C-alpha cells in the first residue's frame, strides 16, 4: 500500500478542480473589493463634480463671494463681518464720497452706463422732436463749463428780475411785494419746497382722484436735527457757505454777513416748527382735509387762495378752461399743526428777510450745485468741511443725475434698450408670485389676526399690482417723444434749457389736478437702483436698474436670487403691512380695516422690533440706532427675509436643484442668507455715519444684517447657530 493510501487522504481529480475554483473565486472577490473601494473613494471625493457649475458666470460669482467673505470669523458670532470682512478691506472710501457700499457701487455702474449712452453722438442730436435727442443735448450743455460761464449770469438776472429783485444783492423791493405770489411762481416753475411743500398727488382717502397737497418743507441741511441741536459744525459751515455765495453774487460783504445770519436764523425757526420724522409714521393722524375757505379764515397770515390760484395761473383743463380754485376747493394737509405754527411765524419776520430766504433756497437748489468755479469750489469747501468729499466729483456725475431726474423716461428708454436682460422680467414675475403666495400662507397662519382681517389682508396682497423693469411704451420711440414733446431746448444755454425743463416737468404734475389717477403710470423711471411700494395705488415697483448683481443675475443660483432681489420683493410687499402701509386698504385708501384688538397686537409686536433695534449700537461711532424712526423699514427687512426664504423653499421643490458654485463650501440655504448680507457690505466715514443715524429711515448696513438674521430661525438652522449665540438670541422679535 502507498503511503497516501495508508493515511486515508488520497485525492481525486474533482477535488483539484474545487481548489482551482476556490482560488479563482478568491481572486474575483479581491478584484470586486478593489473595484468597490475605488468606487467608494471616487464617490466620496468626486461624486459632486458633475454638480459643480464651471461656467464663466458661476466662476465669477464664486470669486466675488469668496473675495468678500472673512471666513475666519464665526458666522454665528458676527455674520456681517463673516459676509463682508474682506470686501470692506478691499474697498476704501473714495475721495469724492463719504461712503462706499455694494448698493452705491451699483448706482455708480448705472450712472456710468448712462454716461456712455448719453455720450454717443453717431448722428446730430434731434433736440426738436426726439426725447433722447433732448436728453443728450441737455447732458452736453451741462458738461460745457465755458459756455455756462458765458451765459449763466444773464439767465440768473432775468429770473431774479421776474422775482422782483433779491434784496441781499442790493435790489430795491417793491412796496407791494407778495410772499404768496413769489413763492407760487417758485413752486410752479422750479419745484420749490423751502417754505412748505405744495403739489398734486392722489388723495390718500380717495385714491382714484388727485388733490392739492401741503406738507412740511425740505430744508437745505441734511435733517431737522442739525438746526434744532446745539451749535454744530454743519450749521456753521452752512452759514459760511451762504455768506461766501452772496459775495460771489456781488453782494456787499457787510450786508452778506448780516443777511446770511438772518437767513439761517429763519431757516432754523422753520425747522423748529416742523415735526420730527420719527413722529410722522401715522399718516392717518397726519391727514387733514380742509377747504381753502377754512384755511383763509383759520390761517389769516398767508393768503392761501391767492397762492394756489397764482401757482396754477398758466394751467388749463383739457377743454381749455383755466384751472382756478375757490373757497370750496379741498386741500389735504399732512401735519396741520405745522401750518398753524407757520401762520404764527410769518408775521414775526419782515418780507425782506423771507424773500432773501426764498431766493437763497432757489439759487442753492437750482443753480449753485452745477455752476463751475468759483462757485463749484465754494460748495466743495462746504462739503469738505462736512467730510462729504475730499476731492470734487467729476462733472459728468451731476449731469447724468440731473437729466435722469428731469427726463426719466427718455434716459430709461436708452438704458433698457442696451442694458436690460429681458429674461429677468419673466423670472422675477415667478419669484413675486411665490413670495406673495408665501406671505398669504403666513397671514393665514397668524393667530393674532382675526378671520376678517386675514381675508382683507389676503385680498390686499392678491390685488397688489406689480411693475417690473420698465413700462412697455419705452419700446416705442414715438410714445417717448410724445411724453416730452413740450420740453424745449435752448441751444447754447444750459440754465435756460434746465429751467424750461423744470417748468414743464412741474406743469405735467400740477395739471393732474383735473384728471383721475392713472394707475398704469410709473412713479419712477427704469434707470434707477431702487424699489418701491406705493401705498395709495397698492403696487410694488422694481425698476430695471435694480435687476443686476448683487440683487439678481441669470448666473446666480436661485438661492442667491431669492436672497437678493427676492428679499427686496418681500421687503416691498411687507411695506403694505408695516406701521404705515397697514393703514391703507386694497384700493389704496386710508381707512381702519383692522379691528382695535388686532391693532393693539400689531403695535405690541412692532414695539418689540423698535425696542430691539434701539438697543443696537453702531460700534464705529458708539451711537444707538433710532428704532422708532427706522421701525417701518426694519419691519419690512424682517418680513421680507422670511417670505423670500419660504418662497425659495417652495421654488426648490418645484425646480431641479441648482449646481454648486466652485470652491464655495456652502449649502444653498447658507448662500441665500450670505447674499442677503453681502448686499449691505459697505463702509462710511464717522460724520456720514452720524448723518445717516440722524436722517435715514433705514438702519445702517451692519444692523440690516444683524437684526433680521438674529430674528430668523431659518438662518440659525442653516448655519447651525447655538441658541444664545450672538446671531441666535433666545428672545426674538417678529411682526410677520
Curated annotation (Swiss-Prot):
Disruption phenotype: Severe defect in olfactory plasticity in response to the odorants benzaldehyde, isoamylalcohol, diacetyl and pyrazine. It is found in: Membrane. Its EC number is 3.4.24.-. Belongs to the peptidase M13 family. Its cofactor is Zn(2+). The chain crosses the membrane at residues 20-40. Binds 1 zinc ion per subunit. Disulfide bonds join 53-58, 76-721, 84-681, 142-399, 608-733. It is a single-pass type II membrane protein. The keyword Iron does not apply. One of its GO terms (cellular component) is plasma membrane. Expressed in muscle cells, GLR cells, SMB motor neurons and AIM interneurons. GO terms for molecular function: metalloendopeptidase activity; metallopeptidase activity; zinc ion binding. SUPFAM superfamilies: Metalloproteases ('zincins'), catalytic domain (SSF55486). Residues 41-736 are extracellular. Its main location: membrane. Keywords: Coiled coil, Disulfide bond, Hydrolase, Membrane, Metal-binding, Metalloprotease, Protease, Signal-anchor, Transmembrane, Transmembrane helix, Zinc. One of its GO terms (biological process) is protein processing. Residues 103-123 form a coiled coil. Required for olfactory plasticity, which is the change from positive chemotaxis to dispersal after prolonged exposure to an odorant. Thought to antagonise snet-1 by degrading excess snet-1 peptides and thus enabling olfactory plasticity. InterPro entries: MetalloPept_cat_dom_sf, Peptidase_M13, Peptidase_M13_C, Peptidase_M13_dom_2, Peptidase_M13_N. It is an enzyme of class 3 (hydrolase). It comes from Caenorhabditis elegans. This is Neprilysin-2.
Amino acid at each position: 500500500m502507498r503511503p497516501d493510501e495508508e493515511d486515508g487522504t488520497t485525492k481525486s481529480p474533482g477535488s483539484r478542480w474545487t481548489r482551482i475554483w476556490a482560488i479563482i473565486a478568491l481572486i474575483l472577490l479581491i478584484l470586486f473589493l478593489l473595484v468597490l473601494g475605488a468606487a467608494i473613494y471616487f464617490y466620496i471625493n468626486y461624486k459632486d463634480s458633475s454638480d459643480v457649475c464651471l461656467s464663466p458666470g458661476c466662476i465669477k460669482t464664486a470669486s466675488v463671494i469668496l473675495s468678500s467673505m472673512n471666513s475666519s470669523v464665526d458666522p454665528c458670532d458676527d455674520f456681517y463681518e463673516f459676509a463682508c470682512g474682506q470686501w470692506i478691506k478691499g474697498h476704501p472710501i473714495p475721495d469724492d464720497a463719504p461712503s462706499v457700499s455694494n448698493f452705491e457701487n451699483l448706482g455708480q455702474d448705472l450712472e456710468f452706463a448712462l454716461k456712455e449712452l448719453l455720450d454717443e453722438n453717431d448722428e446730430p442730436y434731434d433736440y426738436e422732436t426726439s426725447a433722447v435727442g433732448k436728453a443728450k443735448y441737455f447732458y452736453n450743455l451741462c458738461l460745457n463749463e465755458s459756455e455756462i460761464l458765458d451765459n449763466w449770469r444773464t439767465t440768473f438776472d432775468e429770473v431774479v428780475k421776474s422775482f422782483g429783485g433779491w434784496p441781499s444783492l442790493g435790489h430795491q423791493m417793491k412796496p407791494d411785494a407778495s410772499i404768496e405770489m413769489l413763492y407760487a411762481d417758485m413752486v410752479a416753475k422750479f419745484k420749490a419746497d423751502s417754505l412748505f411743500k405744495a403739489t398734486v398727488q392722489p388723495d390718500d382717502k380717495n385714491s382714484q382722484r388727485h388733490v392739492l397737497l401741503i406738507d412740511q418743507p425740505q430744508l437745505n441741511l441734511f435733517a431737522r436735527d442739525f438746526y434744532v441741536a446745539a451749535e454744530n459744525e454743519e450749521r456753521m459751515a452752512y452759514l459760511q457757505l451762504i455768506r461766501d455765495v452772496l459775495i460771489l453774487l456781488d453782494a456787499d460783504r457787510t450786508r452778506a454777513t448780516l443777511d446770511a445770519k438772518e437767513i439761517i436764523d429763519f431757516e432754523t425757526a422753520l425747522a423748529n416748527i416742523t415735526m420730527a420724522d420719527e413722529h410722522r409714521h401715522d399718516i392717518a393722524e397726519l391727514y387733514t382735509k380742509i377747504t381753502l375757505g377754512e384755511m383763509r379764515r383759520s390761517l389769516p397770515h398767508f393768503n392761501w387762495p391767492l397762492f394756489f390760484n397764482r401757482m396754477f395761473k398758466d394751467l388749463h383743463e383739457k377743454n381749455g378752461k383755466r384751472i382756478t380754485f375757490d373757497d370750496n376747493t379741498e386741500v389735504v394737509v399732512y401735519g396741520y399743526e405745522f401750518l398753524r405754527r407757520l401762520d404764527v411765524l410769518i408775521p414775526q419776520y419782515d418780507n425782506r428777510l423771507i424773500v432773501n430766504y426764498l431766493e437763497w433756497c432757489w439759487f442753492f437748489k437750482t443753480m449753485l450745485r452745477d455752476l463751475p468755479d468759483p462757485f463749484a469750489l465754494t460748495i466743495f469747501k462746504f462739503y469738505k468741511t462736512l467730510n462729504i468729499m475730499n476731492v470734487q466729483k467729476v462733472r459728468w456725475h451731476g449731469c447724468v443725475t440731473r437729466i435722469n431726474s428731469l427726463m426719466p423716461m427718455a434716459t430709461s428708454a436708452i438704458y433698457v434698450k442696451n442694458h436690460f436682460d429681458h429674461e429677468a422680467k419673466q423670472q422675477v414675475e415667478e419669484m413675486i408670485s411665490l413670495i406673495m403666495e408665501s406671505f398669504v400662507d403666513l397671514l393665514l397662519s397668524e393667530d393674532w389676526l382675526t378671520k376678517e382681517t386675514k381675508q382683507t389682508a389676503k385680498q390686499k396682497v392678491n390685488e397688489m399690482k406689480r411693475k417690473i423693469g420698465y413700462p412697455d411704451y419705452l419700446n416705442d420711440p414715438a410714445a417717448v417723444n410724445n411724453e416730452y414733446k413740450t420740453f424745449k431746448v435752448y441751444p447754447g444755454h444750459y440754465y435756460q434749457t434746465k429751467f424750461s425743463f423744470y417748468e414743464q416737468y412741474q406743469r405735467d404734475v400740477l395739471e393732474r389736478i383735473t384728471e383721475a389717477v392713472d394707475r398704469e403710470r410709473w412713479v419712477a423711471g427704469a434707470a434707477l437702483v431702487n424699489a418701491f411700494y406705493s401705498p395709495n395705488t397698492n403696487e410694488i415697483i422694481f425698476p430695471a436698474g435694480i435687476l443686476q448683481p448683487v440683487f439678481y443675475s441669470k448666473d446666480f443660483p436661485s438661492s442667491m436670487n431669492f436672497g437678493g432681489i427676492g428679499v427686496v420683493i418681500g421687503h416691498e410687499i411687507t411695506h403694505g403691512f408695516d406701521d404705515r402701509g397697514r393703514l391703507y386698504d386694497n384700493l389704496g385708501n386710508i381707512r381702519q380695516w383692522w379691528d382695535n384688538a388686532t391693532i393693539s397686537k400689531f403695535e405690541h409686536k412692532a414695539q418689540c422690533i423698535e425696542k430691539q433695534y434701539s438697543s443696537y449700537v453702531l460700534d464705529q461711532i458708539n451711537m444707538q440706532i433710532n428704532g422708532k424712526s427706522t421701525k417701518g423699514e426694519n419691519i419690512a427687512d424682517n418680513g421680507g427675509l422670511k417670505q423670500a426664504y419660504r418662497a425659495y423653499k417652495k421654488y426648490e421643490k418645484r425646480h431641479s436643484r441648482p449646481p454648486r458654485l466652485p470652491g464655495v463650501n456652502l449649502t444653498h440655504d447658507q448662500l441665500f442668507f450670505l447674499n442677503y448680507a453681502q448686499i449691505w457690505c459697505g463702509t462710511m466715514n464717522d460724520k456720514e455715519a452720524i448723518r445717516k443715524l440722524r436722517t435715514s429711515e433705514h438702519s445702517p448696513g451692519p444692523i440690516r444684517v444683524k437684526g433680521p438674521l438674529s430674528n430668523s430661525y431659518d438662518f440659525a438652522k442653516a448655519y447651525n447657530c447655538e441658541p444664545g449665540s450672538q446671531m441666535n438670541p433666545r428672545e426674538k422679535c417678529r411682526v410677520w
